[in-house]
């Protein structure tokens, strides 16, 4: 694996810059069990050595292989609404479900790069 090699993918409504061997957090895929293998086809760009391969909008000959590590819940965020000079106060909490996955390989034209 070259340390200069990375890809930009779209997953879970967000774009992520991914490298082989690193793990990333994305939106909830709790229906997938740990150690489930995943393939991501929505690859926007690949940086290989000193050249860029850019898709319009996706690279049709590229894919990312990875696996699910685990799912968990993020830290609680407290939302507090208050209208001044009124007796309106509302306190609410929210915890986002998150899935952590690891990238096993970046493939371009069927070859692991």
Curated annotation (Swiss-Prot):
The keyword Hydrolase does not apply. GO terms for cellular component: chloroplast; ribonucleoprotein complex; ribosome. NCBIfam families: L21. Belongs to the bacterial ribosomal protein bL21 family. This is Large ribosomal subunit protein bL21c. It is found in: Plastid, Chloroplast. This protein binds to 23S rRNA. GO terms for biological process: translation. InterPro entries: bL21-like, bL21-like_sf, Ribosomal_bL21, Ribosomal_bL21_CS. The keyword rRNA-binding applies. It comes from the Eukaryota. GO terms for molecular function: rRNA binding; structural constituent of ribosome. It holds the Pfam family Ribosomal_L21p. Keywords: Chloroplast, Plastid, Ribonucleoprotein, Ribosomal protein, RNA-binding, rRNA-binding. Part of the 50S ribosomal subunit.
